[in-house]
Design a protein with these regions (language model features):
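A conserved acidic beta->alpha catalytic loop
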Residues: 26, 33, 42-52, 64, ...
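Glycine-rich, basic loop-to-helix element that forms the pyrophosphate-binding segment
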Residues: 62-79
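Conserved donor NDP-sugar-binding/catalytic core segment of glycosyltransferases
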Residues: 95-128
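Short, flexible, basic/aromatic active-site loop/helix in glycosyltransferases
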Residues: 132-173
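Non-catalytic, C-terminal membrane-associated alpha-helical segments of glycosyltransferases
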Residues: 238-248, 252-306
Length: 306
């Protein structure tokens, strides 16, 4: 009888190898499951520093850089385990992470699930979220509301599932952030994997929306936690453009791009009015410059520029 591995850990890689090598060490030190039952796949997305060959690790070397979704798909293509653990390269795992996540997903059946994710600042990263709408994006785009980020009111406005994120019981949610996801490999392939039109951001939202349409539930498992660095190595403005463009691709795919573009432009002009008033008291506030930057982000997103 051919033995089917229980777990394939798929790690998209771009950057420095050290954090991924630390994850590999953590996976090999897992308790509650035979480490030999954990297959490790690293998907090197043409990193400037190539990932080294490591004994017992499958390294997929992609021919061209394609972003998170393509790297995940390439990694899952090489995987053989029943459950795929999609792990960001900047995670820190404790030594019972795999066994506890397996127990949770096997309890719920054919699902996609994420643990609770904590940043190095000790704060949760709002893993569970509602499927995005134009109003959610505009709420985040409206800069005068930024001062309210510490409030649950603001988090609800941008689509965070406050009840799930602050609860202690397993919660069925719309979608979970993609830093640490567990899903059956057969389900991943049946749904068609990640949509490779997304370069960075929103591919996990789209994937889970398709899971929802197929009747596959998504769960947050708050009893299991991982630590996540977050942010990546790219400049902040570039990350903002990646996110904006990805949101436009998602909105176009699901039929509300025009609504999103119009609402963000209106919000940008409201931001301009608020910043103009602020500029009367603070000469460092460049209302016209902020407006130009926001309108250019929207235009680039419509042109699908990253």
């Amino acid at each position: 009888m051919i033995h089917t591995l229980r777990v394939s850990a798929v790690i998209p890689f771009y950057g420095e190898p050290e954090p991924v090598l630390a994850i590999i060490d953590s996976l090999r030190a897992q308790q509650g499951i035979d480490p030999a039952d954990i297959e490790i796949v690293v998907s090197d997305d043409v990193s400037p520093t190539p990932f080294p060959d490591v004994e017992g690790v499958t390294v997929v070397r992609r021919p061209v850089n394609g972003g998170f979704g393509k790297a995940v798909n390439s990694g899952v293509d090489a995987a053989t385990g029943k459950w795929v653990f999609i792990l960001n390269s900047d995670l820190e795992l404790d030594n019972t992470f795999v066994s506890r996540m397996l127990a949770a997903v096997e309890r719920h059946g054919e699902v996609l699930a994420s643990p609770q994710i904590i940043g190095h600042d000790g704060k949760q990263q709002w893993v569970a979220r509602k499927f995005p709408t134009a109003a959610h994006v505009a709420w985040e785009w409206f800069t005068p509301l930024a001062r309210f980020k510490p409030t649950n009111w603001w988090h609800r406005g941008v689509g965070h599932d406050v009840e799930a994120c602050t609860g202690t019981a397993d919660a069925k949610v719309d979608w979970v952030m993609g830093a640490c996801m567990v899903v059956p490999r057969a389900t991943f392939n049946r749904i068609g994997g990640m949509d490779e039109r997304f370069y960075m951001n929103s591919e996990e939202v789209d994937f889970q929306y398709r899971l929802s349409n197929a009747g596959v539930d998504r769960y947050l498992i708050p009893s299991v936690t991982v630590t996540h660095e977050g942010g990546g190595s790219s400049p902040s403005e570039r990350r903002v453009q990646w996110l904006t463009t990805a949101r436009f691709i998602y909105a176009d795919k699901w039929g509300w791009e025009k609504k999103l573009a119009n609402l963000l432009r209106v919000t940008s002009y409201v931001n301009f009015l608020v910043n103009s008033v602020r500029g009367l008291r603070n000469k460092d506030v460049d209302a016209r410059g902020f407006l130009a930057t926001e309108l250019e982000r929207i235009a680039k997103a419509e042109r699908r520029e990253n």
